[in-house]
Structures are given as C-alpha cells and as structure tokens.
Amino acid sequence: MALLDLCGAARGQRPEWAALDAGSGGRSDPGHYSFSAQAPELALPRGMQPTAFLRSFGGDQERNVQIEMAHGTTTLAFKFQHGVIVAVDSRATAGSYISSLRMNKVIEINPYLLGTMSGCAADCQYWERLLAKECRLYYLRNGERISVSAASKLLSNMMLQYRGMGLSMGSMICGWDKKGPGLYYVDDNGTRLSGQMFSTGSGNTYAYGVMDSGYRQDLSPEEAYDLGRRAIAYATHRDNYSGGVVNMYHMKEDGWVKVESSDVSDLLYKYGEAAL
C-alpha cells in the first residue's frame, strides 16, 4: 500500500492490477513470476511451441532465412583460499557482427552474490535479475541472506520449467554464505553443478588450458588475479568472438569487490614483451 500512496492513489482504492485472484490464490497477472505464488509461471503465447516456430524458419533454404542464435564469449570463475575470482571478457557479438566492446557480463545480484552471462544476453539478464528479486524477497521474509546453494537451485528450477523452449543460458553463480565461498554452474537445461573451477562460452577451452596450468588452492590474491587475467586475455587472442576488456571481481567474506577492467590488447602486448 505504501507504493500506492507514493503513486498518488486514494486510500481504500485498489486498482485491478493490485488485486489477487481469489479463486486461484495466486496473482491475477499471468506475466508475473514469483515463487510466492501457487502457480509460478509465465504466460506463453498461443500457437506452436517456440522451438518448432524457430525450426520452421531455419529449414527453408529458398527464403534464405536463418534464425540460429550465433554468439560467443569467455567467462570463468574459480575458488581459492581467499574466496572466488570471477573474470569475463566484454565483447558482445551477433553472428559475425561485433555489437559492443564494453558489455559487462557479470550481473551483480546482491553484495554477496554474482552471476555471469554466457549465451543469449536477454535470457541471462532477465532470469538473473529475476533471481535477484527472489533473493531480496527471501532476505525480507527470513531476515538472513539466501545461501549460494539455494540461489543456484532457484535459478535451476526456473530453467527446468522452460526446458526445451529455446532459452540459451550458461551461468555461474558465486557468492559467500555461512558455509564459506560457493560456486555453481547453471544452464538452460536446468543442469546445476558445484565445483572449484568453471569456464563457459566459445573461448572456454582456451581459458581452461591456462587455468589448469596455473591453478592452486593456495594462490595469493595477486596470483589469482594474474591467473584470471591471463586466462581471459589468451582466450580472446584465440577466439574471434571474445575480446574487449577483462572485467574481474573478487568475492570475499565481506562481499564482492571489482578488481579491474583491463584492455586485452594491452595485456597481450605486455605478456608478449615479457616473453622476449
């Protein structure tokens, strides 16, 4: 009601969008998604399934129509003795077209949770912002922060409800809770994995090669920063769909901090000079 007062609505009046459906016990707005409602789901448009609709365009060679999402990125995250390091590139592509060189592929869910973007940018941003809302509601209802495990499970449950409907998302959820640092991988199929190290995107094979050669649990913060920095920089050198700058975050016990934004061209030049 405080929001209605702020908007200037008279007391005692409730607009249609603010009323609950008494018969179902859930919200009357079919486009609202909330775990607090009895039937938390988004309304789908009438007609054929989204995957069948897209397939009908992709198979017609005479019209030369191709609606296959072509995208690329390189994101990584790994745990070590001082928390979790998250490093991503910043190049956004639409097929062979580079649409942006300054896209931040880390979504700041709350001061103790971070999510990465890999796949379709719209899907990643929408669902992780929805996750941020649910994490905030959990805090308001329970008086404590949601755990990293529970947050990743919420995102996985969202993906399971829309499995096979054309979503494209591969995200890493990292944070710090009562159990310490946590790192999970969640994709559009609802897959949820816990681990020490993950990398997603078209350049992940190159990033894994660098991380595997230098990763240790007892890394110092500066060594961990350099490892994440090198992994993204060398991945952008080999992968045409990755580039821009290296955005790096460090998840600590008292919350995340943004470490740096370094241009990959400058980094590769510096590494090349050091190798001579």
Swiss-Prot record:
Endpoints of the signal sequence: none
Keyword Cytoplasm (UniProt): yes
Catalytic activity entry: Cleavage of peptide bonds with very broad specificity
Entry coiled-coil feature ranges: none
Entry's EC annotation: 3.4.25.1
CDD domains in alphabetical order: proteasome_beta_type_5
Inducers of expression: Up-regulated by interferon gamma (at protein level). Up-regulated by IRF1. Down-regulated in spleen by deoxynivalenol (DON), a mycotoxin that alters immune functions. Down-regulated by the selective inhibitor PR-957. Up-regulated by heat shock treatment. Down-regulated by EGR1 in neuronal cells.
Residues annotated as the enzyme's active site: T73 (nucleophile)
Principal place of residence: cytoplasm
Any GO MF annotation of the entry: threonine-type endopeptidase activity
GO cellular component: cytosol; nucleoplasm; proteasome core complex; proteasome core complex, beta-subunit complex; spermatoproteasome complex
Keywords per UniProt: Cytoplasm, Differentiation, Hydrolase, Immunity, Nucleus, Protease, Proteasome, Threonine protease, Zymogen
Subcellular location field: Cytoplasm; Nucleus
Tissue: Detected in liver (at protein level). Expressed in spleen, thymus, lung, liver, heart and, at a very low level, in kidney. Not expressed in brain nor testis.
Propeptide residue interval(s): 1-72
Pfam families for this protein: Proteasome
GO biological process, one term: proteasome-mediated ubiquitin-dependent protein catabolic process
Site (Cleavage): G72, T73
Subunit structure: The 26S proteasome consists of a 20S proteasome core and two 19S regulatory subunits. The 20S proteasome core is composed of 28 subunits that are arranged in four stacked rings, resulting in a barrel-shaped structure. The two end rings are each formed by seven alpha subunits, and the two central rings are each formed by seven beta subunits. The catalytic chamber with the active sites is on the inside of the barrel. Component of the immunoproteasome, where it displaces the equivalent housekeeping subunit PSMB5.
Function recorded in the entry: The proteasome is a multicatalytic proteinase complex which is characterized by its ability to cleave peptides with Arg, Phe, Tyr, Leu, and Glu adjacent to the leaving group at neutral or slightly basic pH. The proteasome has an ATP-dependent proteolytic activity. This subunit is involved in antigen processing to generate class I binding peptides. May participate in the inflammatory response pathway. Required for adipocyte differentiation.
Similarity remark: Belongs to the peptidase T1B family.
Record protein name field: Proteasome subunit beta type-8
Gene name tied to this protein: Psmb8
